[in-house]
């Protein structure tokens, strides 16, 4: 984030972390504002060889600890410095 390019920190949990291969990363935004849905597509494309799209499609997403509704993914825009989390479905027993 220090190079002046807007970026976000993305956290991956559970199966998303396993698929992506690490628990977090910083991603530069190509433009701002940048739709959250476009960030998800960018990540899916970056890790397409690992089958990321299938896992990311099932995730809930949060931005700065606010859960984003599925129908808001296109409307929700990122401007840089946000913390975005990919949260796969969980179950208990």
From Swiss-Prot:
Q: What does this protein do?
A: Acts as a sulfur carrier required for molybdopterin biosynthesis. Component of the molybdopterin synthase complex that catalyzes the conversion of precursor Z into molybdopterin by mediating the incorporation of 2 sulfur atoms into precursor Z to generate a dithiolene group. In the complex, serves as sulfur donor by being thiocarboxylated (-COSH) at its C-terminus by UBA4. After interaction with MOCS2B, the sulfur is then transferred to precursor Z to form molybdopterin.
Describe its partners and assembly state. Answer: Heterotetramer; composed of 2 small (MOCS2A) and 2 large (MOCS2B) subunits.
The protein in question is named Molybdopterin synthase sulfur carrier subunit
Q: InterPro entries per the record?
A: Beta-grasp_dom_sf, MOCS2A, MOCS2A_euk, Mopterin_synth/thiamin_S_b
Which organism's genome codes for this protein?
Mycosarcoma maydis
Spell out which residues are annotated as carrying 1-thioglycine: 93
Keyword Nucleotide-binding annotated: yes
Residues where Glycyl adenylate is found: 93
Q: Which residues form the signal peptide?
A: none
Q: State the similarity comment.
A: Belongs to the MoaD family. MOCS2A subfamily.
GO CC terms of this entry: molybdopterin adenylyltransferase complex; molybdopterin synthase complex
Instruction: Give the subcellular location.
Output: Cytoplasm
Cross-referenced HAMAP family: MOCS2A
* Pathway(s): Cofactor biosynthesis; molybdopterin biosynthesis
Record keywords, A-Z: Cytoplasm, Molybdenum cofactor biosynthesis, Nucleotide-binding, Phosphoprotein
């Amino acid at each position: 984030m220090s190079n002046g390019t807007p970026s976000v920190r993305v956290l991956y949990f559970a199966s998303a972390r396993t698929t992506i291969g690490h628990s977090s990363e910083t991603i530069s935004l190509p433009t701002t504002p940048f739709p959250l849905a476009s960030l998800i597509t960018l990540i899916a494309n970056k890790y397409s060889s690992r089958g990321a799209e299938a896992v990311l499609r099932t995730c809930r997403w949060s931005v700065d600890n606010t859960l984003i509704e599925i129908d808001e993914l296109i409307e929700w825009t990122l401007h840089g410095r946000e913390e975005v989390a990919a949260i796969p479905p969980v179950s208990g027993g």
